């Protein structure tokens, strides 16, 4: 598996930032989804304390590559397949945002479905393949990796990558600062069973808007 030392360091700093500022680990509204990340019991409001953990069996994207007949940039396995974690909030010179991570194996499989959908849409639009790693808080801006060279860009759904942020995913993550913020309890519309809270709702809305164009 390709290594992303910047992600390992960011996860460590993330936990440390919450302990130093709030004297507690980060909390997440997991909607009663089980995860190896959970620390202790759910609180009275339904949130859980969590800490990122290294997966016993790393997640791989071989099935996605086979389905699409496409070789994916190796960093996708290190970014999504090494840990179980809640989404990660950050501050940066480009603004604040979130990095997508996977909460459990079901979440990982749902992620794969979404990446397949994203890559199929890029092919349909005759655009170069990219895969998403998060979102910026500014409107509908996705953070995506150029699958050809591994660089990180801003991308609007339905458009080509527009603003280059870093030459590599490792470099991009090294430029982020953990953002300490209370957990957000989302009031969501009824969704299929595989839909997940938080950042997934934002991704769903972006793709719904794209398909509606």
From Swiss-Prot:
Name the record gives this protein: Protein Syd
SS bond partners: none
Keywords, in A-Z order: Cell inner membrane, Cell membrane, Membrane
Domain of life: Bacteria
HAMAP family, A to Z: Syd
Gene (UniProt): syd
Gene3D superfamilies referenced in this protein's UniProt entry, alphabetically: Syd protein
Native organism taxonomy: Bacteria, Pseudomonadati, Pseudomonadota, Gammaproteobacteria, Alteromonadales
Family of this protein: Belongs to the Syd family.
InterPro entries named in the record: Syd, Syd_sf
GO CC annotations on file: cytoplasmic side of plasma membrane
Record's subcellular location: Cell inner membrane
CDD domains recorded: Syd
Organism of this sequence: Shewanella halifaxensis (strain HAW-EB4)
Biological role: Interacts with the SecY protein in vivo. May bind preferentially to an uncomplexed state of SecY, thus functioning either as a chelating agent for excess SecY in the cell or as a regulatory factor that negatively controls the translocase function.
Membrane-protein topology: Peripheral membrane protein
């Amino acid at each position: 598996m390709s290594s992303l030392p910047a992600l390992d360091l960011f996860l460590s700093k993330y936990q440390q930032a919450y302990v130093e500022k709030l004297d507690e680990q980060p909390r997440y509204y997991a909607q009663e989804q089980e995860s190896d990340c959970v620390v202790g019991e759910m609180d009275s409001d339904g949130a859980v304390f969590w800490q990122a953990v290294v997966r016993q069996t790393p997640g791989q994207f071989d099935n996605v590559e086979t389905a699409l007949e496409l070789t994916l940039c190796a960093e996708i396995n290190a970014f999504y397949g090494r840990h179980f974690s809640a989404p990660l909030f950050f501050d940066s010179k480009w603004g604040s945002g979130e990095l997508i991570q996977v909460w459990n194996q079901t979440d990982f499989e749902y992620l794969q479905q979404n990446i397949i959908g994203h890559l199929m849409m890029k092919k349909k639009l005759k655009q170069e393949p990219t895969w998403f790693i998060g979102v910026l808080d500014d409107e509908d801006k996705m953070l995506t990796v150029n699958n050809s060279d591994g660089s990180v860009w801003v991308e609007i759904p339905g458009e080509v990558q527009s603003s280059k942020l870093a030459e590599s995913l490792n470099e991009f993550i090294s430029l982020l600062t953990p953002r300490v913020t209370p957990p957000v309890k989302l009031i969501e519309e009824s969704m299929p069973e595989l839909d997940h809270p938080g950042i997934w709702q934002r991704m769903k809305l972006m793709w719904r808007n794209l398909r509606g164009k």
